[in-house]
């Protein structure tokens, strides 16, 4: 399922994503009667289990590659690091996985030797998606993945994410403040306000009202 989580700035969307990734810092505390992803009870996971799950079973794409990517590492180094953290592969196998991830986001192999500062906004966003996909996650969290892009690139990136979800049978939580945009690309929409869910609808219910 592709689920959209929408709301104005400060409504709690990104904090919800951080909770699902186990990234809520103390004194913050996650409070829920149940919180699970892919059969994992996130309320009881120890740190070691979180490290194994995060970036592997659950992956996240952030909104701005200028801040999310390491500026002093090449694209290859960052993809390779994501793989070696979670999989025991030889160099040839890692190269195959890296090139597969690049093809998935429609980037040429030459990008591997570039640094983030040498990439356009759209290319940087595709690199972040490739890093998220390289370990074949079951769930992808995309936190405002198109907010730093123009309208043409926004649709390209969202169409790319949808295509990868369908090809990989991968679930996606798409976080945005743009309800009309995400409703086109998701099955269901949750609306948040001041940290609470205030509405829920099927995407076709929203589009039929436009």
Describe each PLM feature range:
Residues 182-184:
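A short, surface-exposed alpha-helical micro-motif characterized by mixed small hydrophobic
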Residues 155-168:
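Helical segment within the ABC ATPase nucleotide-binding domain
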């Amino acid at each position: 399922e592709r689920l959209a989580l929408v709301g104005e700035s400060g409504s709690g969307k990104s904090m919800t994503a951080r909770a699902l990734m186990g990234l809520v810092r103390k004194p913050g505390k996650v409070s829920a009667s149940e919180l699970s992803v892919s059969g994992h009870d996130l309320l009881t996971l120890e740190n070691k289990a979180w490290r194994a799950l995060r970036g592997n079973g659950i992956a996240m794409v952030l909104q701005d590659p200028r801040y999310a990517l390491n500026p002093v590492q090449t694209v290859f180094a960052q993809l390779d690091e994501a793989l070696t953290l979670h999989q025991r592969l030889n160099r040839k196998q890692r190269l195959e996985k890296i090139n597969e991830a690049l093809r998935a986001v429609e980037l040429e192999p030459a990008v591997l030797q570039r640094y983030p500062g040498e990439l356009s906004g759209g290319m940087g966003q595709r690199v972040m998606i490739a890093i998220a996909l390289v370990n074949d996650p079951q769930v992808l969290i995309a936190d405002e993945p198109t907010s730093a892009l123009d309208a043409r690139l926004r649709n390209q990136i969202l169409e790319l994410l949808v295509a990868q979800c369908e090809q990989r049978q991968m679930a996606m939580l798409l976080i945005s403040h743009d309800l009309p945009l995400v409703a086109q690309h998701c099955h269901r929409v949750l609306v948040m306000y001041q940290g609470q869910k205030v509405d829920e609808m099927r995407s076709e219910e929203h589009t039929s009202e436009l």
